[in-house]
C-alpha cells in the first residue's frame, strides 16, 4: 500500500541518521489513523534524536499536535515563518487569512482529543473572537 511505501522510505532515510528530514505530504496515501501513527513516530524521532523535521502538509490538522514553528504561504508568497502562536497572530492580521485562525487554534487546542478529551467547538464568530481575545489577539472579529 501507499502507507507501507511511505514507511519504508522513512526507514531508509532514518538508517543514515540525518540531522534534518524534509517530507512533502508524507501521509497523502494514508488513512487518518496511519497518518497520526506516522506523525507520532516522527515526533518521537525528533524527541529522542533531536532530528529537525520539516513537513509540507496541506492537512494541517494532522500536524497540529506536534507543531512548534510554522511557515505560512499565500499565493506562493511567504506570509510568516515563526512560532505557532506568532504565525497565528500574523495570519489574524491578514484579512483573507483571518477566518482560518479560529479553526487553527481550535485544532491546536484539540491535541487533548488524542487523550480522550473532547473540546467544545465555536458555534459563532463571537465565540471565536472571545476565545482569540483570551489568547491575546487584538480585534473584535474572528
What are these regions (language model features)?
Residues 10:
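Hydrophobic anchor residue at the start of the ABC signature
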Residues 57-58:
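H-loop/switch region of ABC-family ATPase nucleotide-binding domains
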Residues 21-24:
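Catalytic Walker B motif of ABC-type/P-loop ATPase nucleotide-binding domains
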Amino acid at each position: 500500500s501507499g502507507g507501507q511505501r511511505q514507511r519504508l522510505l522513512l526507514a531508509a532515510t532514518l538508517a543514515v541518521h540525518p540531522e534534518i528530514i524534509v517530507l512533502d505530504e508524507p501521509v497523502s496515501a494514508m488513512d487518518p489513523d496511519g497518518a497520526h501513527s506516522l506523525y507520532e513516530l516522527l515526533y518521537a524521532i525528533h524527541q529522542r534524536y533531536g532530528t529537525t523535521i520539516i513537513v509540507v502538509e496541506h492537512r494541517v490538522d494532522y500536524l497540529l499536535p506536534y507543531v512548534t514553528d510554522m511557515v505560512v504561504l499565500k499565493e506562493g508568497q511567504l506570509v510568516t515563518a515563526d512560532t505557532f502562536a506568532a504565525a497565528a497572530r500574523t495570519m489574524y492580521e491578514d484579512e483573507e487569512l483571518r477566518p482560518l485562525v479560529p479553526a487553527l487554534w481550535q485544532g491546536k487546542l484539540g491535541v487533548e482529543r488524542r487523550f480522550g478529551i473532547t473540546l467544545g467547538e465555536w458555534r459563532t464568530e463571537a465565540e471565536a473572537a472571545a476565545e482569540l481575545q483570551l489568547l491575546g489577539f487584538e480585534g473584535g472579529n474572528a
